[in-house]
Each structure stands twice: as structure tokens, then as C-alpha cells.
């Protein structure tokens, strides 16, 4: 039904499109529309239940893929950035912290330079006004070899694998292999993984790096 379609879309938006930022600006033309033509031939979904959950799961997967592609297609972008925050006190805090991180111009510039600057991540978390304990927070950068900005599915990476570098542990900066960090962060898709110990909630957000081309593109035309 129209009511359940609207409910599903609003639920999906919270963990997909609302977790995307290219440059922090929202166009007045940004629009999201969902329509159903009835051609699937299934029984109309009029309430929550197994069929609704199946539809919602499929919708979330589709919207997640599209949200990542929006971030990957940012003006002048060379790198897709996914930020995962785990161990937050609630889902809202986890998502908000992740989005604060990927929205930071300094973090975005560091991602362009493949610079493992965890201080900028902590700075963004700090000025967010959100509740977290930096003394029990840890940070990794991870990636997959030969990763691309454009893909159909993007799972969180194992944080202790070949393409992972931990830079901050329980409030203490770590000595780390700078060459490895550069390699990890030079891939086209990079994950910032933040582990808190404030609860059991997780959230994520997607963004991109801030490049010279972004400034050129937006400095060369009038909107």
C-alpha cells in the first residue's frame, strides 16, 4: 500500500541517503521518489510482517548501493570513504559521529593525500557535541587491494588483515608503518573504522575526498 511504501522508504533513508555527504551542501533540487506500478503481481503489503521485512531488506540493499555511488561520484572525487562507528551508546550517535567524520573538510583533504591523520578524525568527533569517550576509542584505516570507487556491494573489511592499519588505541596514538598506511589509504575505496566502548550500537556514513578538481569545478561555473 502507499502507506507501507512510504513507511519503508522513510525507514531506509535513515541508514542510506541521510548518511551520505559529498561537500556538506544540500541542493534545493535534491529529490527522492519511490513508485510502485503493481507489475510484480504479489499480494499487496498493507501491514508489517514477513513480506514487508523482505521488501524492506531489498530496498535497504538497493538504497545502500545507490548511496555509495552518490558519494563515489562526488565532484572531483578520487576516493570513496566509508566510516564505520561501532560501540556507540545508540544508533543515532553512531551514525551522527560517522557523518561528522566524513563531512570534515580536513578529514576529506587527508583522505585525498592518503594521510593517516587520526587527529582530524578525533577533532571532528570532538566538536560534534556527541557523547563518546576518547580514552576508550580506537581507530583503523582499512582497504582492499585494487579497490574501485564504483561497485555493486561494499562490505566492511576485516580490521586485522593485510590492508589494515591501526593508528589509535584506547586513547593512545600508536606507532605505525607509514608506508603501509600510505598503501592502505591510496586505494580508491577506504574505510575509516572507529571503535568506541560506550555501548553496542553501530552506524556508518559515506563520503569522498576533497580534491583540487573540486575547487576547480565549483569555481568555474555559476549556479
Explain the meaning of each model-derived region:
Residues 1-223:
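A structural signal for small-residue-enriched, beta-sheet-centric alpha/beta enzyme cores
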